Regions:
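Amphipathic, interaction-prone secondary-structure segments
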Residues: 60-64, 68
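A common structural junction motif
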Residues: 68-77, 108-110
Length: 110
């Protein structure tokens, strides 16, 4: 993820990293790096982005923990996790109001 993974530059939307306690920020950054390293696919959505997650690189409970932090600093995101049957693909959808798609696309560039 670009920047700090919470706040894409040049976007009309802004996250508040201060919403995550100072004591929790190291864990947040650790999880953010794990999420970024686990992305194995991307799919544009009308109002956001879906990212395919390699669960060999990040466990589902850790993905959920990262989402809990993101909900604090970026409350304008909507999250959905789709788990396919028979150990199929895991997709995390990040969507929201106008501008969120561009914000998320920039955050997950690369």
């Amino acid at each position: 993820m670009a920047n700090n993974g919470c706040c894409a530059s040049g976007s009309p939307l802004a996250c508040d990293l201060g919403a995550i306690s100072a004591s929790d920020r190291p864990r947040y950054h650790e999880l953010r790096r794990s999420v970024a390293a686990s992305v194995i696919g991307k799919r544009e959505l009308p109002d956001g982005l879906a990212i395919q997650i390699d669960t060999a690189r990040i466990a589902l409970p850790h993905l959920a923990e990262w989402i809990s932090f993101e909900r604090k600093c970026c409350p304008f995101f909507e999250f959905r996790i789709d788990l396919a049957p028979d150990s199929g693909p895991v997709w995390l959808s990040l969507t929201g109001r106008a501008g969120v798609k561009e914000f998320i696309t920039e955050a997950f560039a690369g």
